[in-house]
């Protein structure tokens, strides 16, 4: 029986649920940015206050995840959560008696290479099955490849069909027990197939951009099941993609001329030095670029950042008050950031107190609980009254959202637990470091950070404008730090 099309509803795309080979592409990088793992608090901020000016997110397009019950022939039955397809139509007839079903989503072009596999559970009476890709307009009463804007590999003959009723010799026939893989390479616009893990070669060239996986059946009892990446593939598609990347890496890393190599090295040294200085690593920065290293207050900022990241808020505030006395007067965002961290500290202290009181006795009295909560509630009220005075809309939204922690006995297991994490405190330490840099007349972003941001944006722009080879790359994992 056809399953309810629940996976046709709009749902967040989870990076962990992507096939591994897609995680390493530009598509995977875009999914990661919209995934809570990228920066959990920024993800929640976007969902919490989507009306804030300038807060526009590019949601990645969904990838195929099942067969589409709303785009299939009536002669097909979908089963197993719309992953399986069974033909129960007439046993014989014309070419129009075939039955096809498309996937629930088109393949995003920035996947660079897309691949799926079909397992033949039963060849049925004649094994007249077709596997391939098609445009949205393909009729569902034909096998893939036998009609315009569709490409298919047929099991009963081993022929390939290129938008035509006439087939050409291509590969072996396939039958019950076989696993047929079908891939599209958007970089060179080709379609290829595999059989039982073996590569069969390029079948079609100059194919369209917007494609759907499609399966077609024609004889009674034919039964197949699809793997869109929810399970490991038989064919090593990860290796195939890495080989494509290696070709491009080789082109990009060809030995430059000696003069160009020297200029590159000087440029890289300056980038690294700027990053180290912004983060307070003065001595290391001198090693890379001794002539341009301006020490200024880098060591002091590093010490403050370390205190904040380690939860030593009082020490950090004392240091800031001593080293940057004007900052407290001139930077409301700095004051509010420190008060925000104080609030989170109070949330932790209050939780610890409630936990201690409830040990031994199963339930803490309401009166005792209120007594413990009162200082936190008072501080939260003061913070709520003042947070709108800050200039940073992100800081305002974070404070507003964090007030939800008050609703939970255990904030560490709540949906807002990321506020209590060491990663978030490191993030806030970085933001405060940026504020101190601005106060002392320096850019809050190092040259290296701006260069990397530019690289990521440039790669995205090239991908959107049809530079297909760039879609292979996930700048984050390929060139920075693997996740």
From Swiss-Prot:
One of its GO terms (cellular component) is GID complex. InterPro entries: B30.2/SPRY (IPR001870), B30.2/SPRY_sf (IPR043136), ConA-like_dom_sf (IPR013320), CRA_dom (IPR013144), CTLH/CRA (IPR024964), CTLH_C (IPR006595), LisH (IPR006594), SPRY_dom (IPR003877). CDD domains: SPRY_RanBP9_10. GO terms for biological process: cytoskeleton organization; negative regulation of gluconeogenesis; proteasome-mediated ubiquitin-dependent protein catabolic process. It is found in: Nucleus; Cytoplasm. Pfam families: CTLH (PF10607), LisH (PF08513), SPRY (PF00622). Residues 264-296 form the LisH domain. Keywords: Cytoplasm, Nucleus. Identified in the GID/CTLH complex. In the absence of stress, the complex exists as an inactive anticipatory complex (GID(Ant)), composed of Gid1, the E3 ubiquitin-ligase Gid2, Gid5, Gid8, and the RING-like subunit Gid9, awaiting a substrate receptor to form the active E3 ligase complex. When cells are shifted to glucose-containing medium, the substrate receptor Gid4 is induced and becomes part of the complex, named GID(SR4). Additionally, Gid7 transforms the GID(SR4) E3 ligase core into a higher-order supramolecular assembly (Chelator-GID(SR4)). Component of the GID E3 ligase complex recruiting N termini and catalyzing ubiquitination of proteins targeted for degradation. GID E3 is regulated through assembly with interchangeable N-degron-binding substrate receptors induced by distinct environmental perturbations. Required for the adaptation to the presence of glucose in the growth medium; mediates in association with the substrate receptor Gid4 the degradation of enzymes involved in gluconeogenesis when cells are shifted to glucose-containing medium. This is GID complex subunit 1. It comes from Schizosaccharomyces pombe (strain 972 / ATCC 24843) (Fission yeast). The lineage of its organism: Eukaryota, Fungi, Dikarya, Ascomycota, Taphrinomycotina.
